[in-house]
């Protein structure tokens, strides 16, 4: 099993392109498979321009994607509107849908129209709401082999006791999709545990400075800790094995000592 690790840069660039580049570089150095940003229009989305300084313009999104390609890390992005879906679709290999967009039907229809693989966070949602979102995405007809559902608790930060990793099993059984975990807890223990429980995608917020001003920095980890997390996840991958119960080659000498064969 290979875990796809996403470094969620989100809005931790604080509206500065140079910081966005540094986040991409840090994600690559830490061993992440992808780095993810957000594309939104705050006035259109929330009728509130207080976080307008955290927006990235279309041209900036394209420049960040180009930078990611130049350093060898996948560029991911979450669109928060139909227009933004059209902007990012030519730049990404997959689209990440945020928990807050689970009931935005026009957006989901536009995501379906891209025919790209989908990663869907499920924070704040019940099975029934997820089912309706999957119908809007055309999952049952067209996307069955290219959907990953992320267990997510939309609290920043999330308490460990609210992470509910067992819900990954529920999602897998209910919808037959790949499952993963979008982690908002402090530290890296819960993300590593999710990998051990079979998550195929781990998403974790990355910041250059946890003490910086901004909505997500306190629910993020810095590059050195992110690197430790990725290494631990890769160790978990090795330890999981293939599930076949058999005598391992490393046991041969011990078996000979006990049984003589």
Where are the language model's segments positioned?
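Catalytic cores and adjacent flexible loops of soluble metabolic enzymes
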Residues: 1-261
């Amino acid at each position: 099993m290979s875990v796809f690790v996403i470094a969620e840069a989100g809005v931790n660039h604080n509206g500065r392109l140079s910081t966005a580049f540094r986040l991409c570089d840090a994600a690559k150095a830490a061993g992440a498979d992808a780095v993810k940003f957000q594309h939104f229009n705050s006035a259109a989305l929330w009728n509130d321009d207080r976080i307008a300084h955290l927006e990235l313009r279309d041209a900036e999104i394209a420049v960040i994607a180009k930078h990611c390609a130049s350093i060898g890390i996948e560029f991911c992005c979450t669109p928060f509107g139909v227009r933004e879906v059209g902007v990012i679709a030519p730049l990404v290999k997959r689209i990440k849908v945020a928990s807050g967009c689970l009931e935005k039907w026009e957006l989901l229809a536009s995501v379906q129209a891209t025919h790209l693989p989908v990663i869907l966070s499920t924070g704040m949602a019940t099975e029934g709401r997820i089912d309706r979102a999957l119908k809007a995405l055309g999952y049952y007809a067209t996307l069955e082999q290219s959907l990953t559902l992320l267990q997510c608790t939309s609290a920043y930060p999330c308490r460990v006791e609210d992470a509910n990793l067992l819900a990954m099993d529920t999602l897998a059984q209910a919808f037959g999709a790949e499952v993963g975990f979008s982690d908002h807890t402090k530290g890296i223990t819960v993300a590593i545990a999710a990998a051990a429980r079979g998550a195929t995608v781990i998403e974790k917020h990355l910041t250059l400075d946890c003490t910086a001003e901004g909505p997500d920095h306190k629910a993020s980890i810095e590059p050195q800790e992110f690197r430790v997390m990725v290494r631990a996840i890769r160790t978990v991958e090795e330890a999981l094995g293939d599930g076949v119960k058999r005598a391992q080659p490393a046991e041969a000498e011990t078996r000979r000592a006990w049984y003589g064969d």
